[in-house]
Amino acid sequence: MEIRGIFGVKVGMSQVFTTNNERLPITVIYCEPNQVAGVKTEAKDKYSATLLSFDTVENKKLNKPQQGFFEKNNLKPTKHLQEIRNMTGFEMGQQITPQNLFQVGEYVDVSAISKGRGFTGAIKRWNFKIGPLGHGAGYPHRFQGSVQAGRGGASAQRVFKGKKMSGHYGHEKVTVQNLRIVGFDEANMLVLVSGAIAGPEGGVVLIRTAKKKPGVVKPIELAVQTEKAPEAKPAKLSKKKQAKELAKAQAANQQTVEAKVDTPVVEPKPTEVKKAAPVVEKKGEDK
């Protein structure tokens, strides 16, 4: 089976609507172009794989062996280096984008590292039933109960390996199968995948060919959504606050009315036009 895959970063979740008015929850994944940093072959390495590098960083943030690897192969320094087995047909230094590997509606498997929850009890870790809270049950109520396997003799006097008990929970690889590619946002380098995937926001994600449905495509038609400004809803106030607001409004109206009555109306005076004095000529004066 031909394997295709690409690495990205989980951004978060959202939702879209189809033409049948069905709400479809989606996960948004940021996928910048992955560069091929190495090619493994059956003849030389006894297995076939493609080494991908992603998440470009400054060269000074890498250690000496990593800097030497990228300088030797004339590649951009990146934060992550990881290979995908049985992925063939690519050359050294080639840039891979999700649009080149998948199409809208194609089934894929998405792998990520789940959120780490530390040391947890059996109730949270294995969904055990909580103990009785009353009738003299006593404390604590969240014990997992007996883990005893036998009482001696022919019975085993030990706890078998794999027993569901308290312990470290989370921070493990989780793969969700048979999700579909809903769409691409080439301008922002985003991939929309149906459903939820493991891991926190900002976690590394692997999108690869579906193991159970390789190459199967089921088209998805999304409804065109027109963005509208949300209407401002009046705030709900209690009766006391409504009475206070009404009293303030009435007082403000009364003050404006009183101000209009008290202020005298001043009429503008008509402008007086000054006439020029007549010129009188004196007789009998020679210049």
Curated annotation (Swiss-Prot):
| Pfam families, alphabetized | Ribosomal_L3
Q: Which parts of this chain are annotated as the region Disordered?
A: 228-287
Enumerate the UniProt keywords alphabetically. Answer: Ribonucleoprotein, Ribosomal protein, RNA-binding, rRNA-binding
Is the NAD keyword given for this protein?
no
Please indicate if the UniProt record lists Ribosomal protein as a keyword.
Answer: yes
From the record, give the transmembrane residue ranges.
none
Q: For this entry, list what GO says about its biological process.
A: translation
Give the record's GO CC terms.
Answer: cytosolic large ribosomal subunit
Basic and acidic residues bias: where? Answer: 269-287
One term of GO molecular function = structural constituent of ribosome
Q: Give the protein's biological function.
A: One of the primary rRNA binding proteins, it binds directly near the 3'-end of the 23S rRNA, where it nucleates assembly of the 50S subunit.
Quaternary data: Part of the 50S ribosomal subunit. Forms a cluster with proteins L14 and L19.
State the family named in the UniProt similarity comment for this chain. Answer: Belongs to the universal ribosomal protein uL3 family.
Q: What is the name of this protein? A: Large ribosomal subunit protein uL3
Species name for this entry? Mycoplasma pneumoniae (strain ATCC 29342 / M129 / Subtype 1) (Mycoplasmoides pneumoniae)
